[in-house]
Amino acid sequence: MVAFGKKLKERSIQEWQGYYINYKLMKKKVKQYSRQLEGGNLERRHVLKDFSRMLDNQIEKIALFMLEQQGLLASRLQTLRGSHDALQEQPDISHMSYLKEEYRAVGQDLLKLLFFVEMNAIGIRKILKKFDKRFGYRFTNYYVKTRANHPYSELQQVFRHVGLGAVVGAVSRNLHELQNNQGSYLSIYDQPVLPLQDPVVDSIRAAVDRLTRSTNFLHFMAQHALIMQEELPSPQDEEGEEEDGRYHFMSLLLNLVNTFLYMVNTYIIVPTADDYSMSLGAAATVCGVVIGAMAVAQLFSSVYFSAWSNRSYFKPLIFSSIVLFIGNLLYALAFDFNSIAVLLIGRLFCGLGSARAVNRRYISDCVPLKIRMQASAGFVSASALGMACGPALAGLLQIRFKIYKLTFNQDTLPGWVMAVAWLIYLVWLAISFREPAREPEEIPKTSEESNHSAVQDVNLEKGMKQPLLLTSEEIEEQGEDECDGSEEASEDSRTPANSILAAYRLLTPSVKVQLLIYFMLKYAMEILLSESSVITTYYFGWSTSSVAIFLFCLGLTVLPVNLVVGSYISNMFEDRQILLVSEIMVCVGILLSFHVVVPYTVPQYVCSGLIMFVSAEVLEGVNLSLLSRVMSSRLSRGTYNGGLLSTEAGTIARVIADATITVAGFFGRNMLLNVTLLPSLVICVLSIVATCFTYNSLY
């Protein structure tokens, strides 16, 4: 892993070198502070004051240069505006082409400025993170709170690129006008065939979205998948050709279908799980164990599927389909065997076939960057659609008949239908999936060996390129670079974590809080969904069809809610603000769900459940967005990646929630609702408190 300081130097725009954050100087000062504090020669108060002043100066330098460049771009646009107006009066094809090229040139310079701002924003985040890590302070919280919220904030100039929006709008609008030839031609027959989009405008929009982390609907949906991108921007997509060679549309489609079918498989039994349990001689609340058995097995399957995807995508998907076919077959046959054990084994098999880790990994590794966001949004949409279709399908399977000794009814038909679905999918997979080409495998090294080797390689390469005799200044600079590289290799190495323990060590307080929030929302949602059939039957006498319709309606809210949040709300408020409000709304939904004194009514249950579910859906998107932002880049690849950690946190929450339902059954059905909601309330309050403590580090 090349140190960030080196990457900053390599990727920076040469003529603007003096205006970038002096990352090397800031790192040197952090080391100096550390030595002085250890020697007792410096007070902590002086360190904070001096470092704040240095960082303020660096940000001021960046912000003022941004304003200067914006002024130059605005001046050029103003000049072009006059030529554009003249063109409207006297149309001229050659002059129009000239204007388009001039606007594109401004667009290219605007791209350079956006790239400049993004590199500096990353540098500021990294130096703040390094300072906190070195001294154990919560300096980032203090600095962001005092600077970002100030009315004359220069920090906001960098992180919110204040003023650049007008330049982006002017370039885009004028190019669009010229491209659509408004007033430029006397006759429609003279109009050539022009592309609908200009590449420069597309590049500018992509750069702005990346810089602001703007969450339009597509981006907001994609964040649910927690498929992390490279942190450092690059003017060109260096991996584009390689990714295009590995990408295969039908293989991507098969991964998305796998995601959809698995979510259908998860939720298709929810409306009838209590009835199935009672028909086999168990209590209705054993439905918690039946539903949760799949999640228990998924705890283990997520790990081995994630590891397996390092070597192949096709074989894990084949194995997943076979295991899910067997699991659903056992689930369906449990009725005729009159065995709760066979039922549970069937659900365990279904959990062992969870290939969501493979689906995520395929999108992350094989889908080209230009369509990865669409693929990630497709992954989330497939999950949401499966979640809605599962209960709806169960509501349609209200028939009963026998073929020989096999019983087909509302309890067993979900198993039979899913077994047939997985069998068809298996055949399609075997025919259409194409295994992507892989790079030659390297002998794995320990992180210590990798870091040492990386530093040695850098030193050797530099030794071959540099002259034999160096000046004392050059020697000192080289020594600092080597030290920086060594530190970056040990602290910010991009080598993937090679164990759960190694991954856990990479979790900062902010990441731990986000994982706690993810645990909380999955726990609350699982309680709501899994006990819905028992609660509604006890209080309201609902039939299986009524429960299925209720769950189907909940599932249908996912996409519209994300559309509203992703397209509007997230563009008006910061992610951390939406996060905190969503947590509070989940807490409100939980409180409204309690059965206290008044008779429990359908409106109370439906409204409180809707508030809880919708708020949790909004919370999930924002939570995973922030999680991908604050998580170490070492967790973006490998077996023990961020996606696996979030999946495990959510799965553990589901397991505990389903176990809670079964245990609460011993208190009687009249106590089930309140007993299961109490842990949800406690965890939700804890997550709100934890969010408040880490609020200023979520940026």
UniProtKB/Swiss-Prot annotation:
Chain residue ranges for the region called Disordered: 475-494
Domain of life: Eukaryota
Record InterPro entries: MFS, MFS_Domain-Containing_Protein, MFS_trans_sf, SPX_dom, SPXM_SPX_plant
Alphabetized Pfam families for the sequence: MFS_1 (PF07690), SPX (PF03105)
UniProtKB keywords: Membrane, Transmembrane, Transmembrane helix
Domain SPX: 2-145
Membrane topology category: Multi-pass membrane protein
Protein name: SPX domain-containing membrane protein At4g22990
Transmembrane region(s): 249-269, 280-300, 317-337, 339-358, 377-397, 413-433, 515-535, 546-566, 578-598, 606-626, 671-691
